[in-house]
Amino acid sequence: EALCLGHDIGHPPFGHAGEEALEDAMAHAGGYDHNAHGLRTLTRLESPYCDHDGLNLTWETLEGLAKHNGPVSAPGWALEEIDRAFPLELSTWPSLEAQVAAIADDIAYDNHDIDDGLRAGFLDLDDLLALDWLADQWRAVEKRFPHAPRDRQLRELVRTQIGLMVTDLLTHTREQVKGVGSAAEVRAAGRQLAAFSPAMREHERVLKRFMYDRLYYHEEQMETARRAHDVISRLFAAYH
């Protein structure tokens, strides 16, 4: 839970657009890394205690926050600074908890972004049905709930997809961890253990490509991102 709540705490306003603006503005000083800034926030900037800085999180939590996406081969200066204070074994895989937090994040935003795209009018049902996997799920939803309102059927489609992804993750991960007997063996495994099956990975890859083409690079979305970049850049210039 701590990993899921804390792994994006370093994101600036406007998400990735804001981070790109800070990366540009701070290029002369080594750039901006939201992951490293989140760790800095949790270990130094948040200071509710009189006798030490930070939130006094466990090593496992800090390690998971630093490398929930896998081993870090080229840490920036900020993460190197934190690693010196709390040696985090950046070259190894993280705990199973951290791996689950990372893939749960993928499941959440993959499906939440479909909801957002439908509500914003950037996506419609025909767009989704262009993906064979979603088309199969849609036919199952229509068969099971033929008289439900269309908006509820669409929400059922998204809910069904979440369930299938979670079930696949659990099933494949159980197979992956057979024979792994300790946290040290998880870190030394040399590969991601909490993972989708190859078939589900392919479904997710196709879905992500679809979302980039139809939603993330939608002209209205790009214009919003440009405005967000401008806002953060101007605020940085005003307060730096």
Regions from the language model: what does each represent?
Residues Y32-A36, T41-H240:
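Histidine-centered, transition-metal-coordinating active-site segments
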